[in-house]
A protein has these predicted regions:
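N-terminal signal peptide c-region/cleavage motif recognized by signal peptidases
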Residues: 13-15
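Sec-dependent signal peptide recognition
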Residues: 1-9
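Exposed beta-strand and adjacent loop surfaces of beta-rich binding modules
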Residues: 38, 50-54, 96
């Protein structure tokens, strides 16, 4: 019975689309500022109900790691791609594990909360 319920839930959830962020394991590149590195990323929006995505960097325990980017919240229209750069201090690079984008669902009166999605890329490669 439990397996059947799990299959029904998976079939119901499967059509829900999220967003895509590439690459999954980005290359760390030097930036034009000494002591700072750059990560080049790209995001594609599959969701017609979401236009904004927040960028975050986390350590292995999901604590925030300081970073800089042109916009901490990106506007990405439906079926469009947006390229962005994230800058980290070399001193924080060993701590930084995940670079994530989270969909920002617009709050509306009288409308039930929609699903928010978070996609993460791993900054330290395949290291555990």
């Amino acid at each position: 019975m439990l397996t059947r319920a799990a299959l029904i839930i998976m079939a119901w959830v499967a059509p829900i689309s999220a967003h895509e962020m590439t690459p999954a394991y980005p290359k760390i590149k030097p930036s034009y500022v000494s002591g700072v590195v750059k990560v080049e990323m790209s995001i594609f929006n599959y969701r017609s109900d979401v236009k904004y995505y927040q960028i975050n960097v986390f350590d292995a325990a999901w604590n925030s790691v300081p970073f800089s980017t042109q916009y901490k919240v990106l506007k990405v229209k439906h079926s469009e791609r947006n390229n962005f750069d994230v800058y980290l201090r070399k001193a924080d690079l060993k701590r930084a594990v995940y670079l994530c984008t989270t969909s920002k669902v617009k709050k509306q009166v009288g409308v039930k909360t929609l699903v928010s999605s978070r996609i993460c890329s791993r900054l330290n490669g395949n290291k555990p």
